[in-house]
């Protein structure tokens, strides 16, 4: 039986049949389907307590201060967020406010640079 035939047979199974298959595989090979998750979550007994922190991959750009040229800041907000004029003005009037959330470090730095060009202060979290 080829790999493709096995996959096709699995695709045609019901949920109950799949559950029975998993149980049979666990018994046949002496493994547990949940074991890899439990092992990954628990630190090893001899492992160092403080592992290096993972580098953040998503950042939030927060407008802290508008500066002297509010109109230019509103234009940048509209360019980055796609908001309408009124929504962008309301956002600028109620700082500190998040401008963009969950963006890459590179994009966050580009957004920050655009705001700094028009005199606004931005924080990246």
UniProtKB/Swiss-Prot annotation:
Q: Where are the transmembrane segments?
A: none
Is Nucleotidyltransferase there in the keyword field? no
The protein's name is Large ribosomal subunit protein bL12
Show the InterPro entries listed in the entry: Ribosomal_bL12 (IPR000206), Ribosomal_bL12_C (IPR013823), Ribosomal_bL12_C/ClpS-like (IPR014719), Ribosomal_bL12_oligo (IPR008932), Ribosomal_bL12_oligo_N_sf (IPR036235)
Instruction: Please report any disulfide bonds recorded for this protein chain, giving both cysteine positions.
Output: none
Which GO CC terms are listed, alphabetically? cytosolic large ribosomal subunit
Query: Species name for this entry?
Result: Caldanaerobacter subterraneus subsp. tengcongensis (strain DSM 15242 / JCM 11007 / NBRC 100824 / MB4) (Thermoanaerobacter tengcongensis)
- The residue stretches assigned to a coiled coil in this entry are none
Keywords of this entry: Ribonucleoprotein, Ribosomal protein
Q: Partners and quaternary state?
A: Homodimer. Part of the ribosomal stalk of the 50S ribosomal subunit. Forms a multimeric L10(L12)X complex, where L10 forms an elongated spine to which 2 to 4 L12 dimers bind in a sequential fashion. Binds GTP-bound translation factors.
Could you tell me what this protein does?
A: Forms part of the ribosomal stalk which helps the ribosome interact with GTP-bound translation factors. Is thus essential for accurate translation.
